[in-house]
């Protein structure tokens, strides 16, 4: 696969292959990196065609990216309170050209807004 050249990869970051249809993820080895638990968790999530998914504490965005790669869910939202992690996850979404199906939001949902779909 060809990596987009309009996505910034900082010197302290690395790009890892998710071994799923050429999908990649940006990670900072000095910060949190996803583990096998995230991959296993994404395997347990049964997402049906047309469903929306919310991943709380998305970190690197690994779960929404994996679920978008392997399911027919409509939209995947990753919610992350750490600015740096949210920004890095957003770049991973762009790197994989998944912005139509995956969005990363920084902050927390304190508004009590209703969520329809699957909560991961």
Segments (PLM) and residue ranges:
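Short, Lys/Arg-enriched N-terminal segments with co-localized hydrophobic residues
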Residues: 1-2
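Conserved SAM/SAH cofactor-binding pocket of Class I
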Residues: 43-120
């Amino acid at each position: 696969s060809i990596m987009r050249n309009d996505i910034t990869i900082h010197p302290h970051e690395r790009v890892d292959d998710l071994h799923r249809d050429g999908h990649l993820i940006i990670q900072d080895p000095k910060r949190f990196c996803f583990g096998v638990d995230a991959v296993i968790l994404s395997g347990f999530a049964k997402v049906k065609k047309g469903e929306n998914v919310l991943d709380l504490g998305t970190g690197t965005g690994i779960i929404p990216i994996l679920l978008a790669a392997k399911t027919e869910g409509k939209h995947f939202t990753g919610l992350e309170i750490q600015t740096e992690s949210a920004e890095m996850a957003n770049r991973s979404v762009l790197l994989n050209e998944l912005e139509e199906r995956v969005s990363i939001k920084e902050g927390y949902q304190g508004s009590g807004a209703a969520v329809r779909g699957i909560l991961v």
